[in-house]
Design a protein with these regions (language model features):
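Sec-dependent N-terminal signal peptides
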Residues: 2-13
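Bulky hydrophobic segments
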Residues: 20-25
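Hydrophobic alpha-helical membrane segments
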Residues: 26-209
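Boundary at the C-terminal end of the N-terminal hydrophobic targeting segment
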Residues: 15-18
Length: 209
């Protein structure tokens, strides 16, 4: 019972506290249900650390934490976390170069890379199949992004699936079910994120021909 009440108390405290961080608005929204708030809570907590440190500043706009909060609110906790996993994979040292290649927009005055949760239409016509990209990543995570033209993003995605997957396998093999199930859940989230990310990359993240 105490384990259930603790997140409720934390959510209530953050909702009624001063809203200084982007995720707080989503957390306090009446359109966000209790399950979504439970997922957004760690994001809001993280923003209280990352938004006060230049070393943890995100290169994207909106930031990965706020992007995740919006994704969970718009698509629910399961699909939303998968969409967030896709963004986390793309938030890597190669993001700026890929953004230049697709002639992406920049947010002023901080020049962060504009990347919205919802994209209305592709900037450029793609000769890559989003369905094929998603199918490839279903078989082998990361290969869909590689097919869509982002080889390094694909490597990052494959790594983000293999790392927790290996930890899950080792933990379950050693009889550590709680730890194993935890890492298995993370593996599933990033696996789904790879399928979504491959589709999104092929459809929206293409440069001019």
């Amino acid at each position: 019972m105490l384990k259930i009440l603790i997140p409720i108390f934390l959510i209530t405290g953050l909702v009624y506290s001063q809203q200084n961080y982007p995720a707080d608005t989503v957390l306090a929204s009446l359109q966000t249900n209790i399950f979504e708030k439970t997922v957004i809570l760690p994001i809001a907590t993280w923003q209280r650390i990352s938004y006060n440190s230049e070393l943890l500043a995100c290169q994207f706009y909106p930031s990965c934490s706020n992007y995740g909060a919006l994704a969970v609110r718009n698509y629910g906790p399961i699909i939303g976390t998968a969409i967030t996993a896709d963004r986390i994979v793309r938030c890597n040292p190669f993001a700026l170069n890929y953004h230049y290649e697709m002639h992406g927009e920049f947010h002023y005055p901080d020049y962060r890379l504009v990347d919205s949760v919802q994209v209305s239409r592709p900037r450029y016509t793609s000769n890559k199949s989003p369905v094929l990209a998603a199918g490839l990543s279903t078989i082998m995570p990361g290969t869909g992004r590689m097919y869509a033209g982002r080889f390094l993003d694909g490597l990052m995605g494959l790594w983000m699936v293999l790392l927790p997957g290996t930890a899950a396998y080792g933990s379950l093999k050693d009889g550590k079910s709680i730890k194993g199930n935890f890492f298995a859940g993370i593996t599933l989230i990033f696996y789904l994120g790879e399928i979504y990310g491959a589709y999104r990359t092929a459809k929206y993240y293409q440069g001019p021909k």
